[in-house]
Amino acid sequence: MRTIASVQLDKRRPALILTRRSKLPLLTWLTVAPITSTIRGITSEVAVGPRNGLDHDSVVSCDNITTVRMSAVGDTIGLLFDDQEPALARAISDAFELDLMSE
């Protein structure tokens, strides 16, 4: 499972913490994907909602992955569950046009 937390970006908004949990205590910066209620229906989005601790249906925007200072991260809002991890991997792959099939 991955944490969804309140993060100071363009404004305070929910974001999915992408940095691996085991390294968080060692880092000053971490990588996040912002969560937005603007749903475009594109392959670089991951659907999230009340099940994940959010107030309404939203998406993880993998086109807008960014790095923030640890101090920008606030309270935990919810979680991205293990069964959503494949969708996250596909969305990140699509956002960066990674060809994972050629290995």
For each feature predicted by the language model, list its residue ranges:
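Loop/turn positions that initiate beta-strands
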Residues: 1-4, 62
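Compact nucleic-acid interaction/catalytic patches
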Residues: 6, 10-50
